[in-house]
Amino acid sequence: GFAAKARAVPVTLGEIPSAMKNYPLIFMSQERPSLLAVTGVYDDINLFVDDNGNWEDFAYIPAYVRRYPFGVAAEENGERMAVVIDRGYEGLTQGGQTPLFENDQMTAQTQAAVDFVKNYERDRQVTDQFAKLLMQHELIQQQSAHYTPAGASEPIAFAQYFGVDEDRLKGLSDETKLELERQGAMALAYALLMSMGNWRLILQRRAKRFGLNEQDVFKPIATN
């Protein structure tokens, strides 16, 4: 299934309240601070998708995945964009039961999909502005995720990522905090910090998926 081998999936600002319940929410880099939901570690396997390509019940499915097979092709300046479709999608067939067009017009289902993609693209642009705002205040920094397996005396760093620096966030001047609060950025920044508790759940999910014990939770798995 789509995104079955993805370790991370893009998410937008409006998805944070739902996505933070399942995934660590991080940024791709400081140069490209796109917001991502972590779905796996070490292996090219999405731990929320089963071997049949189905997402786990009750796990939040990011809009990036739900919009598929539709997507956006945009100019670099972002002034113009076109909604596109993946012609390699297995569900796209000649003479299928659900047509994309009727009488040279988009069907209601196609129009709904196009509207969803357009809304997603607008949300993505707002998310980019949020990330740039955090970058202006140097709040996106390289971080390490740690886990202490049973029997270990010290935590082990198992992932490097870019995320909100809590110390820098707390150290902002009152004036800057107030400015960020007015823009709704403070609450979202703390929501990203709260999502970091899901790193432990990601490792536990990996251990369960591959039958690993606490000591072997970092062990690489051979996959095709």
Where are these regions (language model features)?
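Aromatic- and glycine-enriched beta-alpha-beta binding-site module
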Residues: 26-28, 34-100
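N-terminal ordered "arm"
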Residues: 1-43
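Short, well-structured alpha-helical interface segments that form or flank functional binding sites
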Residues: 20, 60-63, 125, 164
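A contiguous, surface-oriented mixed alpha/beta subdomain in the mid-to-C-terminal portion of proteins
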Residues: 72-224
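Intrinsically disordered, low-complexity boundary segments flanking structured domains
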Residues: 12-13, 23-25, 57-59, 132-134, ...
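Short linear motifs in intrinsically disordered
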Residues: 13-18, 61-63, 134-139
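A short, compositionally biased
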Residues: 19-22, 66-68, 139-143
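Short, basic/low-complexity N-terminal boundary segments at the transition from targeting/disordered tails
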Residues: 1-5, 44-49, 53-54, 123-129
